[in-house]
Amino acid sequence: MTINFKDYIASVQDYPEPGIIFRDISPLMADGKAYAAATDEIAAYAQDKGVEMIVGPEARGFIVGCPVAYKLGIGFAPARKKGKLPRPTVKASYDLEYGEATLYLHKDAIKPGQRVLVCDDLLATGGTIAATIRLVEQLGGIVVGTAFLIELSDLHGRDKIKDYDMFTLMSYTGA
């Protein structure tokens, strides 16, 4: 059975501000079969890449990455916001519309040479995922791919990660 994943995405007009269409993954997660199918597709991609560790940025990267790691029997490392990780970390910053944000990863999360898949729910401008990739590479990990439920292609996030293989379940154009 083939699933049209877009059937499980709620498109919310003018959220969080006028002119934006918010792509809500909650209905996908609420449907066990659709969520499992999405996880299975990303896991198959990861397995083909020989992935040894999954890294996902806070917070929805956890929703995507953890079940994939579980399915493959490999580890998951969270890239978190400031003050959320208790042991020594590395950090990488990225630009926001107004300002800057920083992600952190435990220094021992990735072993040098480890094959890593970076997962998130959505690729928009690419800043978050590019920072997550930098964290992995600071620790000597090899990013063998990136995976997303959704790509917002008009925002050109793909350009920021053009040197990395990318897998996405669905793509949207428009705000």
UniProtKB/Swiss-Prot annotation:
EC class: transferase
Catalytic activity: AMP + diphosphate = 5-phospho-alpha-D-ribose 1-diphosphate + adenine
GO molecular function, a single term: adenine binding
GO BP term (any one): AMP salvage
SUPFAM superfamilies, per database record: PRTase-like
Coiled-coil stretches noted in the UniProt entry, renumbered to this chain: none
Entry-linked InterPro entries: Ade_phspho_trans, PRibTrfase_dom, PRTase-like, UPRTase/APRTase
Protein's UniProt keywords contain Cytoplasm: yes
Keywords recorded for this protein, A-Z: Cytoplasm, Glycosyltransferase, Purine salvage, Transferase
Compartments (UniProt record): Cytoplasm
Family matches, as PROSITE patterns: PUR_PYR_PR_TRANSFER
Protein family per UniProt: Belongs to the purine/pyrimidine phosphoribosyltransferase family.
Subunit record text: Homodimer.
Function: Catalyzes a salvage reaction resulting in the formation of AMP, that is energically less costly than de novo synthesis.
Full protein name: Adenine phosphoribosyltransferase
Native species: Lacticaseibacillus paracasei (strain ATCC 334 / BCRC 17002 / CCUG 31169 / CIP 107868 / KCTC 3260 / NRRL B-441)
Taxonomic path: Bacteria, Bacillati, Bacillota, Bacilli, Lactobacillales
